[in-house]
């Protein structure tokens, strides 16, 4: 299903992944599919995370699951990104070097907070 671009599997450490290993997270590859497949409105956090993972992976970046309480994603084994709404803070990213928040419902970047829509230009 991943080769058909229906799902995206995320692992915590890609260096240790085996064929039989269970992924840490599974997202639909295209966030628009969530609106088609959910009988009610999909969880907005899942939509944001699916969109973010899709945009960066489509641009050729390696997207890993950052781990519990460490942010949402690790990009190219480097920066950690937490995805959330406009009020999302940096508490989950404490102690993480090169960490950023990709925030929905904001128009422009400030400090380490980047608008989620800006990642759409990577596609």
What is each PLM-predicted segment?
Residues 29, 81, 103:
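Active-site flanking residues adjacent to catalytic metal/cofactor-binding acidic residues
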Residues 1-67:
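Accessory nucleic acid-recognition modules appended to NTPase machines
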Residues 52, 56, 71-87:
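Conserved catalytic cores of phosphodiester-cleaving nucleases, focusing on short active-site segments
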Residues 77-80, 97-101:
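Hydrophobic beta-strand segments of well-ordered beta-sheets in folded domains
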Residues 44-47, 86-95, 109-111:
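Active-site-adjacent loop/helix micro-motif of nuclease/hydrolase catalytic cores
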Residues 20, 56, 74-75, 93-95:
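A structural signal for short secondary-structure junctions
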Residues 107-123:
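Domain-level recognition of nuclease-like catalytic cores that cleave nucleotide substrates
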Residues 67-72, 84-90, 102-109:
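Short, polar loop motifs at secondary-structure junctions
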